[in-house]
Amino acid sequence: MIYQGETLSVSYLENGIAELRFDAPGSVNKLDRATLLSLSEAIAALQQQADLKGLILTSGKDAFIVGADITEFLELFDLPQEDLLGWLKKANDIFSAIEDLPVPTLSAIKGHALGGGCETILSTDFRLADTSAKIGLPETKLGIMPGFGGTVRLPRVIGADNALEWITTGKDYRADDALKVGAIDAVVAPDALHSAAVQMMKDAIAGKLNWQSRRAAKKAPLRLSKLEAMMSFSTAAGMVAAVAGKHYPAPMTAVKTVEAAAGMSRDEALVVEAQGFIKLAKTDVAKALVGIFLNDQHIKALAKKAAKQAAKATRHAAVLGAGIMGGGIAYQSASKGIPAVMKDINEKALALGMGEATKLLNGQLEKGRIDGIKMGQVLSAITPTLSYDNVKHVDLVVEAVVENPKVKAAVLGEVEGIIGDDAVLASNTSTIPISLLAKGLKRPQNFCGMHFFNPVHRMPLVEIIRGEQTSDETINRVVAYAAAMGKSPVVVNDCPGFFVNRVLFPYFFGFNKLVADGADFAAVDKVMEKEFGWPMGPAYLLDVVGIDTGHHAGDVMAQGFPARMSKEGRTAIDVMYDASRFGQKNGKGFYAYEQDKKGKPKKVADVAAYELLAPIAKPKQDFDKEAIIAGMMIPMINEVVLCLEEGIVATPAEADIALVYGLGFPPFRGGVFRYLDTIGLDRYVAMADQYADLGPLYRVSDRLREMAAQGKTFY
């Protein structure tokens, strides 16, 4: 044994070939600070080995190294700039020391080698992967960029164009795709990885593979002419500007870093990379995106805990109500290995549901994500039926019929009499209180809400709603089922609109108010999209969701919270609804819709919408972006805070994940609570107070005012 640490060890295999094996105590290998220290000590020990002829990096886990330890990031980002630079330099000295060993080096890669894991393998001369390998640099998704030499070594290994695509998109690549661009040198079967790595190393030691020239290229300036450099970097910058936009600085900073370091040696280029990394690490965007990752991990941990505590796992499920939504839920369940019965009273609805599942699977097939066998397996795991016979023995039923309390109550009561006493019932409802639906049930403890978002296959959030009598066992089983479906379940307590819709409608209230005061709805959309960062502005969102749906939900919210959410006369949404302008579904809403070349709806301005709104609005006036953002966001933020105070949602982390995953709250802002911490509670309260005369939704709670006065934060 040359070296033994807690997370890695070094020992000789044969003939002077040493193996550095990453094998942390947990389920995965991470490059945390402790592992970096061990790696430094291990390389120092190797440097003293007179008999060393070659080094192979391996992993004792299913994955090579999944990346740096992101739980350490926020603490690191808060370090003074000099200390952060010192940490980066020490880390990079380790990878440079691997690269500078006087013997050939090779990485034997299985599973994920991401982020710091990818940068580790780039420090070796050769990279051999098995078919399970996935390689990539996802740092830009966290608002930062590679900091352990990724922007320096990858362009010198696979060329500037390929490297810029890898770094700016943050995608991970399968072994065969990585092989095509030269990121790895060969791909072998998993059971051949070790023997192939040893043989490859023997060939390098024998001089059959020129490891010295490989290494020299990585340490030298990029081989690009002035014209090639100009074309590569200007093209990359243009694409990044179009895709990432101004709110996500990491991809553009990465492009500029690679460009600035193109003519430099390795050591000079690493200094430039460190400067870019630190610049990004100090941004609010990085803290927000890392915060989302950590919140997501928190949600996953809660779901794992629920699965452990559940007395029974869901092996068979049923969906009541087919169509697009029911078909989407059945598909999601079946695609994750949980067979689903899809029951409806209408043959056409069943055909629509199966059609939806088939369409989604065809999309996966065309992208090469599944093969025909997998498609057949998933489709055969969905059983469409007009009768309850196949529903009798399922573990869990998701009711997904029309959003009508009477219809839902009737269906729930009917199916409860058919399923087993320990089977769980869940209602996919967006606004109807769960405790109301539970009133007609004999086993209300086995019932909860399970609110999916449309489209089901794409939206990660599922709201799990606890009714007054819902048992912990029911919640645990439904949370575990949602997680098994690949979703992010957030448990909320029962109230009109639950959490997501309850906080969305104050936002629409703000929209109605702005339009009534003379704002141009298209200008409001533009500000909320381009400046605040929502994927869609409020008018466009209403058109996409359906103005009839929004109108109905708005009435439910007004009844549920009359003191705050009752209407002040006819609203912009009322006007569109009364004119039967329901949005994309019938081609006219706030905008008119035409089909683009792909047959998808494309919005265009429509004078008729403005004419309809004129009687309920003051004369048109321009609002600056600050006034529009304040008018839209203060009602939502205040309602989110109230939901936390009332215990509707348990933690700021769960609230922020629900907002980002369920509503598309701008990820670079991290969610409402991260946003409040970023701008400062005192500053927010002062801003909201300027709008307090607009109504109850604009008035901050006493608790929030108290927190602001005490200088507190939510995280």
Swiss-Prot record:
GO cellular component, one term: fatty acid beta-oxidation multienzyme complex
Gene Ontology MF term list: 3-hydroxybutyryl-CoA epimerase activity; delta(3)-delta(2)-enoyl-CoA isomerase activity; enoyl-CoA hydratase activity; long-chain-3-hydroxyacyl-CoA dehydrogenase activity; NAD+ binding
Membrane spanning stretches: none
EC numbers on record: 4.2.1.17, 5.1.2.3, 5.3.3.8, 1.1.1.35
SUPFAM superfamilies: 6-phosphogluconate dehydrogenase C-terminal domain-like (SSF48179), ClpP/crotonase (SSF52096), NAD(P)-binding Rossmann-fold domains (SSF51735)
Annotated pathway: Lipid metabolism; fatty acid beta-oxidation
Region (3-hydroxyacyl-CoA dehydrogenase): 311-715
GO biological process, one term: fatty acid beta-oxidation
Xref: InterPro entries: 3-OHacyl-CoA_DH_CS (IPR006180), 3-OHacyl-CoA_DH_NAD-bd (IPR006176), 3HC_DH_C (IPR006108), 6-PGluconate_DH-like_C_sf (IPR008927), ClpP/crotonase-like_dom_sf (IPR029045), Enoyl-CoA_hydra/iso (IPR001753), FA_oxidation_alpha_subunit (IPR050136), FadB (IPR012799)
Site note Important for catalytic activity, residues: 119, 139
Catalysis performed (reactions): a (3S)-3-hydroxyacyl-CoA + NAD(+) = a 3-oxoacyl-CoA + NADH + H(+); a (3S)-3-hydroxyacyl-CoA = a (2E)-enoyl-CoA + H2O; a 4-saturated-(3S)-3-hydroxyacyl-CoA = a (3E)-enoyl-CoA + H2O; (3S)-3-hydroxybutanoyl-CoA = (3R)-3-hydroxybutanoyl-CoA
Family annotation (HAMAP family): FadB (MF_01621)
Role according to the record: Involved in the aerobic and anaerobic degradation of long-chain fatty acids via beta-oxidation cycle. Catalyzes the formation of 3-oxoacyl-CoA from enoyl-CoA via L-3-hydroxyacyl-CoA. It can also use D-3-hydroxyacyl-CoA and cis-3-enoyl-CoA as substrate.
Protein name: Fatty acid oxidation complex subunit alpha
Source organism (scientific name): Aeromonas salmonicida (strain A449)
